Design a protein with these regions (language model features):
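Bacterial Sec-dependent N-terminal signal peptides
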Residues: 1-29, 251
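TPR repeat positional signature
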Residues: 23, 61, 68, 136, ...
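Residue at a conserved register position within TPR or TPR-like alpha-solenoid repeats
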Residues: 30, 68, 143, 150, ...
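Post-signal peptide N-terminal segment of secreted/secretory-pathway proteins
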Residues: 32-154, 160
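Alpha-helical repeat scaffolds
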Residues: 41-45, 80-101, 159-167, 207-218, ...
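Structural signature of alpha-solenoid helical repeat scaffolds
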Residues: 52, 127-128, 185, 205, ...
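Short coil turns that delineate tetratricopeptide repeat
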Residues: 53-55, 109, 174, 221-223, ...
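Alpha-solenoid helical repeat scaffolds
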Residues: 58-63, 180-199, 225-233, 259-267
Length: 274
């Protein structure tokens, strides 16, 4: 009896696994179709992304990214044909695609049972992500501007979205997928995006995000001094006096003409009789 029950359990597990793998294949087929039903494709792949049988497969996340890429391409095709199109959908698809491809690459880098890494996704996915970086910037600017027209929770919600776009742009530069590109050195736009990420985070008082992204902007000739302001403010808000004072001193050395650092350091010494 136990053997029969065990066999039934195995059959059920196998059927569930097959069903989810079928969802992944069907979602991919829909996305690659002539008139794709993206809502259906997303419904199928979202099930696979959370199912224990398929959520750890690189292919699942690759298909999720493909759906977003195809959805963005469809909107751009409509724009080219002068048909109604959804600009925000293009931006959101670019953002989601990047995140899905990041996860795909992470899983594909796990060595197989022989200890070998066979990542068949990196080359094409990294090229696609690089091509979509402009839409991450545009999406961030769009939501940042929307936030400036609102107040309270509504503004915070849009600033959070803006930060997500800007942060993902920066995350590309530090992702192992793009190690050969050396984007931290070659991407001249990145410091500006890091500044905007810090600015969006500052508006929400999201100090951990400031401390994560502002350093990528602190050496920039145009916005570096403001990025260091954000860093100092975040360190003070988090109660790290030692690092806060160190950041003020570093700011004075890097940007002696910028009064923020010297003024706050003098105030600290005056208030503490030093």
């Amino acid at each position: 009896m136990k053997r029969v029950l065990f066999s039934m359990v195995l059959l059920l597990v196998a059927s569930f696994t097959f069903a989810q793998e079928k969802n992944v294949k069907e979602a991919k087929s829909i996305a690659n179709g002539v008139n794709p039903d993206f809502a259906k494709a997303e419904e199928l792949i979202n099930q696979a992304l959370t199912n224990p049988e398929t959520k750890d497969n690189a292919e699942t996340w690759d298909v999720a990214g493909l759906i977003q890429r195809k959805r963005s391409e469809k909107e751009m095709e409509n724009a080219y044909l002068r048909k109604p199109y959804d600009t925000l959908q293009v931006y959101n698809s670019a953002l989601n695609m990047c995140k899905f491809y990041f996860k795909c690459d992470e899983l594909a880098q796990i060595p197989n049972e022989k200890g070998k890494i066979k990542n068949k996704y990196r080359k094409s996915n990294s090229a696609t992500i690089l091509a979509e970086r402009g839409n991450l910037i545009n999406g961030g600017i769009q939501f940042f501007n929307l936030a400036s027209q609102k107040e309270g929770d509504a503004a915070n919600e849009d600033n959070k979205k803006a930060l997500d776009f800007f942060a993902t742009y920066i995350d590309i530069a530090i992702n192992p997928m793009f190690e050969k590109e050396n984007l931290l050195q070659t991407d001249t736009v990145l410091p500006q995006i890091a500044y905007y990420a810090s600015l969006a985070a500052a508006k929400m008082e999201d100090y951990p995000s400031i401390l994560k992204y502002a350093p990528y902007a602190q050496d920039d000739k145009e916005v570096g001094k403001y990025a260091m302001e954000f860093i100092s403010t975040a360190l003070k808000a988090e109660g790290d006096t030692v690092k806060w004072i160190a950041s003020l001193k570093e700011g004075i050395q890097k940007y002696p003409e910028h009064s923020f650092f010297f003024g706050h350091l003098i105030d600290y010494y005056s208030n503490n009789n030093k």
